[in-house]
Amino acid sequence: MAHRPRWTLSQVTELFEKPLLDLLFEAQQVHRQHFDPRQVQVSTLLSIKTGACPEDCKYCPQSSRYKTGLEAERLMEVEQVLESARKAKAAGSTRFCMGAAWKNPHERDMPYLEQMVQGVKAMGLEACMTLGTLSESQAQRLANAGLDYYNHNLDTSPEFYGNIITTRTYQERLDTLEKVRDAGIKVCSGGIVGLGETVKDRAGLLLQLANLPTPPESVPINMLVKVKGTPLADNDDVDAFDFIRTIAVARIMMPTSYVRLSAGREQMNEQTQAMCFMAGANSIFYGCKLLTTPNPEEDKDLQLFRKLGLNPQQTAVLAGDNEQQQRLEQALMTPDTDEYYNAAAL
């Protein structure tokens, strides 16, 4: 395998300082070398266990330390989760992500988590989970169940991290990513723009991700969703061009990774989202609820896809599953119906 050069902070900073149009041009060139620019990977995210998290992440309404009005819920029943996955697939998603508000999963919950993964995989969907810190044995059990992706974000640079989270160290996050990788699961890891970080911190986050032994296959870039009751509720809004720059730099630094527009899309107008796609974003979360915060409704996403000439990307599915292509095409051509997946109703 050819040696992959490591990025330096000065190199990343230079990218952030480029004139915006030059940066977008470079990012689009890199993107076209590795991906079909008209294809966007579509995922659906479901909160399978909501609230009462012991962590103190200052941006998160699921923390038990903040009064956000969010009601805590127990781990969902397996069949409830699988029914949501069926609706997600019917609406055109190809990856189903399951998130639980835990510091780490309990051993007693592992059999249910394994059943969820197996059930989602049996539908021909890719399966993704985000459950907090994993042990080696837990990562291996999820891998054996067929889990495709595990999400565990670094959130920000190592230098700024302590201003946002104190209940989990940066090294713990890196260790979990290593255990996931060693178990044979693909890594999904990114961060948040708008925490109060500097451009140098954004560069530091992307530096950490790109310089992992193997960069994440999926890199979600979130725009802070300010939730009343959290310590960051009064943070300044993120400048759209700053966010677009972050997407573009991520694309250049991790040319073969999927760069996902995640939380915060509800706050973006169509023009900002279009520029993010131009900057190299090629994955979105689809549907109107992203764990506990709003996300654009499917029909708005499909309308934007039509305007921009974008298509949902297909993924490898199980043999005998011939409905996927038809459903993806139908999702693009059919106006909004009651059958569209609506996570907010769960």
UniProtKB/Swiss-Prot annotation:
Residues at which [2Fe-2S] cluster binds: 97, 128, 188, 260
Q: Which molecular function terms from Gene Ontology are attached?
A: 2 iron, 2 sulfur cluster binding; 4 iron, 4 sulfur cluster binding; biotin synthase activity; iron ion binding; protein homodimerization activity
What is this enzyme's EC? 2.8.1.6
Q: Which SUPFAM superfamilies match?
A: Radical SAM enzymes (SSF102114)
Regulation of its function = Is physiologically inhibited by accumulation of the reaction product 5'-deoxyadenosine.
Q: In Gene Ontology terms, what is a biological process of this protein?
A: biotin biosynthetic process
Reported cofactor(s)? [4Fe-4S] cluster; [2Fe-2S] cluster
Q: What is the effect of changing residue 60 to A?
A: Total loss of activity
Recorded metabolic or biological pathway in which this protein acts:
Cofactor biosynthesis; biotin biosynthesis; biotin from 7,8-diaminononanoate: step 2/2
- Tell me what happens on changing residue 188 to A: Total loss of activity
Please state every residue range assigned to the domain named Radical SAM core: 38-256
Q: Which UniProt keywords apply?
A: 2Fe-2S, 4Fe-4S, Biotin biosynthesis, Iron, Iron-sulfur, Metal-binding, S-adenosyl-L-methionine, Transferase
What the entry lists under SMART domains is as follows: BATS, Elp3
Q: Which catalysed reactions does the entry list for this protein?
A: (4R,5S)-dethiobiotin + (sulfur carrier)-SH + 2 reduced [2Fe-2S]-[ferredoxin] + 2 S-adenosyl-L-methionine = (sulfur carrier)-H + biotin + 2 5'-deoxyadenosine + 2 L-methionine + 2 oxidized [2Fe-2S]-[ferredoxin]
Cofactor remark: Binds 1 [4Fe-4S] cluster. The cluster is coordinated with 3 cysteines and an exchangeable S-adenosyl-L-methionine.
Question: HAMAP family per the record?
Answer: BioB
State the oligomer form and interacting partners. Answer: Homodimer.
Q: Which family does it belong to?
A: Belongs to the radical SAM superfamily. Biotin synthase family.
The job of this chain, per UniProt, is described as:
Catalyzes the conversion of dethiobiotin (DTB) to biotin by the insertion of a sulfur atom into dethiobiotin via a radical-based mechanism.
Put simply, this protein is called Biotin synthase
Q: Which organism is it from?
A: Escherichia coli (strain K12)
